[in-house]
């Protein structure tokens, strides 16, 4: 059978399962593909295939992640599931699998556990915007009051981390029943169908990169005699058109300039779009006014900052990271988009040191400004060697 063509007509949404070990994330993932294949006609992926997730590298960090896809009536979903807790931590911090929404799987028989809490916190830190809850293994709970209690606990936990706990949709069911094609008390296939409908209605369609305000990290600067200065890079989002006013942000004071041409593969174009590698010709900007590591943006859309809180994963020795812990006052380089900037690390109160393989919240103060927004990913390096990965959780100044 020929490989089916990717259907671009349905809007594309990225989701993933999160939650404590053995609460049924992978079973639910398999059940979702099964139910959607019966109802909406996408492909089935078996449990074993998801569970033995392949290794992949993101920013030099090895992560095991399973990617499956399924369709609802109105959308195409790309879904990630990780076998181990460490894989979730790395995945969410590196942004290897960006989620537009997460499905929190919590066992109704056990209630919220340490990783339930940790994954909700991580979702908050890395900017997962929406969480839908699937209370799993409900077929093992006879007592309706117990179900209510677990539901209340989960809602409280979500509210603790600034998710709308009271309004979060919670679907009660059994992933295993759905996987086996059963549906007693509508806990099997019906519950999973309801989950998909909830994803459709509760998670808004994400804004496409091309519709966001223009941003291009500057990789290189050239001066072309008689034409002016050209900066090159890959457009991260938005569109740049000839005659657009632009700002150059980061590393020095912000300056304004105008785009007088867009060049791609030696051809002149009227515009450059998200995802394209191109050169942008700037009017009135000297070769020495711009450098790699700055960003070219739509005026007013991004501000330069130096101080922020971050969620960081420190590479283990096996991953090629440090062999020893680091302490407060640690000063590595932070690699944002295209450049390294030195920064100072403040650890949370009561934390003396950070071991390789840990994840930690820290406050970072950079020695130069960087154009940044909440959710921006970075690498931590020592002399060009990656020793950690992080994400901006909240900008301070």
From Swiss-Prot:
<feature type="binding site">
    <location>
        <begin position="136"/>
        <end position="139"/>
    </location>
    <ligand>
        <name>GTP</name>
    </ligand>
</feature>
<feature type="binding site">
    <location>
        <begin position="81"/>
        <end position="85"/>
    </location>
    <ligand>
        <name>GTP</name>
    </ligand>
</feature>
<dbReference type="GO" id="GO:0005829">
    <property type="term" value="C:cytosol"/>
</dbReference>
<feature type="binding site">
    <location>
        <begin position="19"/>
        <end position="26"/>
    </location>
    <ligand>
        <name>GTP</name>
    </ligand>
</feature>
<dbReference type="InterPro" id="IPR000795">
    <property type="entry name" value="T_Tr_GTP-bd_dom"/>
</dbReference>
<dbReference type="GO" id="GO:0003746">
    <property type="term" value="F:translation elongation factor activity"/>
</dbReference>
<dbReference type="Pfam" id="PF00009">
    <property type="entry name" value="GTP_EFTU"/>
</dbReference>
<feature type="domain" description="tr-type G">
    <location>
        <begin position="10"/>
        <end position="207"/>
    </location>
</feature>
<keyword id="KW-0479">Metal-binding</keyword>
<keyword id="KW-0648">Protein biosynthesis</keyword>
<feature type="region of interest" description="G2">
    <location>
        <begin position="60"/>
        <end position="64"/>
    </location>
</feature>
<dbReference type="GO" id="GO:0003924">
    <property type="term" value="F:GTPase activity"/>
</dbReference>
<feature type="binding site">
    <location>
        <position position="26"/>
    </location>
    <ligand>
        <name>Mg(2+)</name>
    </ligand>
</feature>
<feature type="region of interest" description="G3">
    <location>
        <begin position="81"/>
        <end position="84"/>
    </location>
</feature>
<feature type="region of interest" description="G5">
    <location>
        <begin position="174"/>
        <end position="176"/>
    </location>
</feature>
<dbReference type="InterPro" id="IPR004160">
    <property type="entry name" value="Transl_elong_EFTu/EF1A_C"/>
</dbReference>
<dbReference type="Pfam" id="PF03143">
    <property type="entry name" value="GTP_EFTU_D3"/>
</dbReference>
<feature type="region of interest" description="G4">
    <location>
        <begin position="136"/>
        <end position="139"/>
    </location>
</feature>
<dbReference type="GO" id="GO:0005525">
    <property type="term" value="F:GTP binding"/>
</dbReference>
<dbReference type="InterPro" id="IPR033720">
    <property type="entry name" value="EFTU_2"/>
</dbReference>
<protein>
    <recommendedName>
        <fullName>Elongation factor Tu</fullName>
        <ecNumber>3.6.5.3</ecNumber>
    </recommendedName>
</protein>
<dbReference type="GO" id="GO:0097216">
    <property type="term" value="F:guanosine tetraphosphate binding"/>
</dbReference>
<feature type="region of interest" description="G1">
    <location>
        <begin position="19"/>
        <end position="26"/>
    </location>
</feature>
<dbReference type="InterPro" id="IPR009001">
    <property type="entry name" value="Transl_elong_EF1A/Init_IF2_C"/>
</dbReference>
<keyword id="KW-0378">Hydrolase</keyword>
<comment type="subunit">
    <text>Monomer.</text>
</comment>
<keyword id="KW-0547">Nucleotide-binding</keyword>
<dbReference type="InterPro" id="IPR005225">
    <property type="entry name" value="Small_GTP-bd"/>
</dbReference>
<keyword id="KW-0342">GTP-binding</keyword>
<dbReference type="InterPro" id="IPR004541">
    <property type="entry name" value="Transl_elong_EFTu/EF1A_bac/org"/>
</dbReference>
<dbReference type="Pfam" id="PF03144">
    <property type="entry name" value="GTP_EFTU_D2"/>
</dbReference>
<dbReference type="InterPro" id="IPR031157">
    <property type="entry name" value="G_TR_CS"/>
</dbReference>
<dbReference type="InterPro" id="IPR027417">
    <property type="entry name" value="P-loop_NTPase"/>
</dbReference>
<comment type="similarity">
    <text>Belongs to the TRAFAC class translation factor GTPase superfamily. Classic translation factor GTPase family. EF-Tu/EF-1A subfamily.</text>
</comment>
<dbReference type="InterPro" id="IPR050055">
    <property type="entry name" value="EF-Tu_GTPase"/>
</dbReference>
<dbReference type="InterPro" id="IPR004161">
    <property type="entry name" value="EFTu-like_2"/>
</dbReference>
<keyword id="KW-0963">Cytoplasm</keyword>
<comment type="function">
    <text>GTP hydrolase that promotes the GTP-dependent binding of aminoacyl-tRNA to the A-site of ribosomes during protein biosynthesis.</text>
</comment>
<dbReference type="InterPro" id="IPR009000">
    <property type="entry name" value="Transl_B-barrel_sf"/>
</dbReference>
<keyword id="KW-0251">Elongation factor</keyword>
<keyword id="KW-0460">Magnesium</keyword>
<dbReference type="InterPro" id="IPR041709">
    <property type="entry name" value="EF-Tu_GTP-bd"/>
</dbReference>
């Amino acid at each position: 059978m020929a490989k089916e063509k990717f259907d671009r007509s349905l809007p594309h949404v990225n989701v993933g399962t999160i939650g404590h070990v053995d609460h049924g994330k992978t079973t639910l993932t398999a059940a979702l593909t099964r139910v959607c294949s019966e109802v909406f006609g996408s492909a089935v992926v078996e449990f074993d295939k998801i569970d033995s997730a392949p290794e992949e590298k993101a920013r030099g960090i090895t992560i095991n992640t399973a990617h499956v896809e399924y369709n609802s009536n109105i959308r195409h979903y790309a879904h990630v599931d990780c076998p181990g807790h460490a894989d979730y931590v790395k995945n969410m911090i590196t942004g290897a699998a960006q989620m537009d929404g997460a499905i929190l799987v919590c066992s109704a028989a056990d209630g919220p556990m340490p990783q339930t809490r940790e994954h909700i916190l991580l979702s908050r830190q890395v900017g997962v915007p929406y969480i839908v809850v699937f209370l799993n293994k409900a077929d093992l709970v006879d007592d309706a009051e117990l179900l209510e209690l677990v539901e209340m606990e989960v809602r409280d936990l979500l509210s603790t981390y600034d998710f709308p706990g009271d309004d979060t949709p919670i679907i009660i069911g059994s992933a295993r029943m759905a996987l086996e094609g059963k549906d007693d008390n509508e806990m099997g296939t019906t519950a999973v169908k309801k989950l998909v409908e909830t994803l459709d209605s509760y998670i808004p369609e994400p804004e496409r990169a091309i519709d966001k305000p223009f941003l291009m990290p500057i990789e290189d600067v050239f001066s072309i005699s008689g034409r002016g200065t050209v900066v090159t890079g890959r457009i991260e989002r938005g569109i740049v058109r000839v005659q657009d006013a632009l700002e150059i942000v980061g590393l020095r004071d912000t300056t304004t300039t105008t785009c007088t041409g867009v060049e791609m593969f030696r051809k002149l174009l009227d515009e450059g779009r998200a995802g394209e590698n191109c050169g942008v010709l700037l009017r009135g900007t000297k070769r020495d006014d711009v450098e790699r590591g700055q960003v070219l943006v739509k005026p007013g859309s991004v501000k330069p900052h130096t101080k922020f809180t971050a969620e960081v994963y420190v590479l283990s020795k096996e991953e090629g990271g440090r062999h020893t812990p680091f302490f407060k006052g640690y000063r590595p380089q932070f690699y944002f988009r295209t450049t390294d900037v030195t920064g100072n690390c403040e650890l949370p109160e009561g934390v003396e040191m950070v071991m390789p393989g840990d994840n930690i919240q820290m406050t970072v103060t950079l020695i130069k400004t960087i154009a940044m927004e909440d959710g921006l990913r970075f690498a931590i390096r020592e002399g060009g060697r990656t020793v950690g990965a992080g994400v901006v959780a909240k900008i301070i100044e």
